[in-house]
């Protein structure tokens, strides 16, 4: 079987690669993935789009590639637009997702609803840079750029929370409730906006374990994806396309 390729925002250079030797997957639901669909639609394998459902807003279908390449957005740049400037124009609109979903060679999967994170305080002498892609809870909070905040991108999905200036692990029951809440939002969004559900799930931050997989299975998910499969034989690993570009 051909290996899976993991793609976020699309660069012009990707089209110089021999993409036909891969099965293409696209994370987050970015507009560039819709924009370049005319160049992708003849790909010999199915195209799989993993959308973060809370990022998809109502809106019309915009233009697609007709010879002009778009500027490439690094994840740090589009994260700033999303979570500091509260802009979502770099993600697909609902109309664009619906158009892609109707294509015969397209599969729609989910990448969680919130892509959630934890915000913590750090010591002034040990400040950590803002994570480039993990500010979902903190829209309209420009003060986090200058104050002593640390964005803990993976910890929410690892079962942690931050309360009373302390990073603590949720109880197993609390963590399960959190995962079920986020997943139900995904499933409901798919039903309400696309008229179908999906059995494809891509893990936020590549965080996965057997318990998480067992919970997701109760919602009907059967195929799981991450950048790395880890120890699980149930998870499809993927190659980051940027590792192939000089």
Regions found by a protein language model. Give the residues of each.
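C-terminal active-site subregion of NodB/CE4 polysaccharide deacetylases
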Residues: 1-26, 30-35, 42-43, 120-246
């Amino acid at each position: 079987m051909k290996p899976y390729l993991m793609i976020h925002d699309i660069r012009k250079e990707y089209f110089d690669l021999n993409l036909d030797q891969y099965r293409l997957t696209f994370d987050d639901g970015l507009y560039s993935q819709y924009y370049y669909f005319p160049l992708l639609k003849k790909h010999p394998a199915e195209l799989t789009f993993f959308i973060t459902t809370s990022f998809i807003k109502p809106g019309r279908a915009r233009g697609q590639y007709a010879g002009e390449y778009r500027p490439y957005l690094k994840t740090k740049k589009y994260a700033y637009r999303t979570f500091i400037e509260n802009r979502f124009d770099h993600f697909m609109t609902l109309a664009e997702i619906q158009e892609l979903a109707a294509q015969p060679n397209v599969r729609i999967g989910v990448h969680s609803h919130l892509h959630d994170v934890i915000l913590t305080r750090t010591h002034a002498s040990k400040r950590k840079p803002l994570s480039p892609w993990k500010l979902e809870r903190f829209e309209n909070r420009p003060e986090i750029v200058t104050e002593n905040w640390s964005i803990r991108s993976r910890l929410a999905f690892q079962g942690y929370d931050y309360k009373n200036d302390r990073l603590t692990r949720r109880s197993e029951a609390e963590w399960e409730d959190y995962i079920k809440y986020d997943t139900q939002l995904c499933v409901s969004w798919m039903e309400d906006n696309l008229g179908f559900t999906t059995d494809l799930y891509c893990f936020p931050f590549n965080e996965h374990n057997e318990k998480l997989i067992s919970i997701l299975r109760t919602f009907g998910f059967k195929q799981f994806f991450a950048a790395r499969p880890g120890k699980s034989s149930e998870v499809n690993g993927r190659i980051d396309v940027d590792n192939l570009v000089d």
